[in-house]
């Protein structure tokens, strides 16, 4: 079974030769290619290079476009702090939903609008 067959069979509940190996490798992939994490999470080409390299080198069954836990929140208007060599993080003292009623006023972000989610879609396209 190749990786694609393994993952699709597993998702469909069919037997597989072994469980798909699908670890979350964001920081590891970035370190493997010697990139700065800020570049990994903001430049889709760096993310793709890291994901392809780590999957090929270690025999993982997939690649992903995850970069940090703040990508979508950022596009919704959350205040996010970026770091040179670790994942971005939301600034908790300025939490977008510190007041839960703010949820009713949030606008849906446009994933193609040039924000951080757009970077993820560019990675998928590569």
Which residue ranges define each predicted feature?
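Catalytic cores of TIM-barrel enzymes
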Residues: 1-126
